[in-house]
Amino acid sequence: GTPKGNAAIFDEWHKEGRHWEGVGYDFVIGNGSDSADGEIEPTFRWWQQKVGAHCGGTPGNWANVDGVGICLVGDFNHTYPTSRQMQSLAQLVRFLESRYNIPKGRIYGHNTTPGANGKTDCPGRHFPMFKLKSMLD
């Protein structure tokens, strides 16, 4: 994770540093550093329904093809998400669950996505997945 950034910064970094088409995520949720705390930024991948580049290594690339990539700005090995980030994340996930009939059991962190290559500690040891799931009830 990175303590600063926003969708535009990640877009540039993914283009220049990784030689991707652009930002790999469908949504970026700010932490107050380079966008508002809790601000949900949809990216071109969401607007154009482009295949993501947020979770490699899954069989058939299913997580990028069929999954929705949501990035929270922050390094959650060293800090916790802000309360506004968590509120926005829960709001966004509830919307996606309802709109696309996604069961709560299909909501994963990057490192717990079935079939992912496992070479990441994302979303970080301080990311409260249990809290997110309880916020969805």
Language-model region placement:
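Short, conserved "active-site rim" segments that organize catalytic pockets and cofactor/ligand binding
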Residues: 1-49
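Histidine-centered active-site/metal-ligand motif
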Residues: 11-14, 26, 52-60, 110
